Curated annotation (Swiss-Prot):
HAMAP family cross-referenced by the UniProt entry: Endoribonucl_YbeY (MF_00009)
Enzyme class at the top of the EC tree: hydrolase
Keywords: Cytoplasm, Endonuclease, Hydrolase, Metal-binding, Nuclease, Ribosome biogenesis, rRNA processing, Zinc
Binding site for Zn(2+): 146, 150, 156
Protein name as catalogued: Endoribonuclease YbeY
Cofactor: Zn(2+)
NCBIfam families recorded: rRNA maturation RNase YbeY
Length: 184
């Protein structure tokens, strides 16, 4: 059903925490992050569009909740060490709140469904954007789309599943007007 207030088929409640800017405003300014910063309204729009595309893989719910935390290499390294036993920074982490085959009872279907949290390192995203020769905002969209797919049960334990996931990320970015070249 199309929501009159937003014009979207799928409703999403997004909590964006820009810890990178809040913790390091001078570094954010010096690094050019401020010029590439994605507004909360833009993130909200992107997630709406992405979830509409991925609607067939969503459990039924009146709306979906997602947390997005933008941080630095130091914090993401600590999180990576704590939860994945990898004591090094990474680009994106996703913490799914649901098991993929979780049975849904009627009470669960009536409430907003919390999908999980995505954590992105701005430092790593900046490096990767430079290596890929595209903007920081493009890299942030790419990494966040990757995290969203993980929240929905996608994984890439082998080359074939990685290629399928990367192809889906390309589709998601095209939906928000970002064209990206990926070498599979």
């Amino acid at each position: 059903m199309l929501s009159e207030e937003s014009g979207y088929l799928v409703q999403v409640e997004l909590d964006v925490q820009d810890c990178f800017f809040e913790s390091f405003p001078e570094a954010a300014q010096a690094s050019g992050y401020m010029d590439s910063q994605v507004s909360p309204a833009t993130w909200q729009d992107w997630f709406h569009r992405w979830l509409e595309i991925l609607d067939s893989s969503l459990p039924p719910a009146p709306s979906y909740e997602i947390g997005l935390r933008l941080t630095d290499d130091t914090e993401i390294q600590a999180i990576n060490a704590q939860y994945r036993q990898q004591n090094k920074p990474t680009d994106v982490l996703a913490f799914a709140a649901l098991e993929v085959d979780l049975p849904q009872n009627p009470e669960m279907v009536a409430e907003p469904l919390y999908l999980g949290d995505i954590v992105v390192s701005i430092n790593t995203a900046q490096r990767q954007a430079g290596q890929q020769e595209h903007s920081l905002s493009t890299e942030l969209a790419w990494l966040t789309a990757h995290g969203l797919l993980h929240l929905l049960g996608w994984d890439h334990p082998d080359e074939e599943s990685l290629i399928a996931m990367l192809q889906q990320q390309v589709v998601l970015l095209e939906a928000i007007g970002i064209n990206i070249n990926v070498n599979y």
